[in-house]
Amino acid sequence: MGRSLKKGPYCEDKLLKKIELMNQSGQKKVIKTWSRRSTIMPEMIGHTLAVHDGRKHIPVYVTEDMVGMKLGEFAPTRTYRGHAGKSEKSSRAR
C-alpha cells in the first residue's frame, strides 16, 4: 500500500537541506545518508548519494529516471552467493 497523495512524498528534511545548499553553491560532493526510506526528488538529479545498506555506504548517482523511487531501492541489503553446487558425495551415492 502506497503513501497517501494528500500527504505527498516523504524525504528526510536534513537530506533535502544539504542538497539545496549544494545546488546553490554548485558543489558536487558525495552525501552520506542512512535514510533509505526517502523519496528521490527532482532537486537530487546529478548528485551522488551514499546510501547505507546495513554494512557500508553504496554510492548512487541520481538520474532523471529515478525520480519518485526510494533511495533504498538502489542499495541492496542482501548478497546472494548462489545455491550450493553438486558435490562428489551426492553424485557417488546414486
Swiss-Prot record:
Coiled coil: none annotated. One of its GO terms (biological process) is translation. One of its GO terms (cellular component) is cytoplasm. Transmembrane segments: none annotated. Keywords: Ribonucleoprotein, Ribosomal protein, RNA-binding, rRNA-binding. It comes from the Bacteria. GO terms for molecular function: rRNA binding; structural constituent of ribosome. The keyword Cell membrane does not apply. Belongs to the universal ribosomal protein uS19 family. Protein S19 forms a complex with S13 that binds strongly to the 16S ribosomal RNA. This is Small ribosomal subunit protein uS19. The lineage of its organism: Bacteria, Bacillati, Bacillota, Clostridia, Eubacteriales.
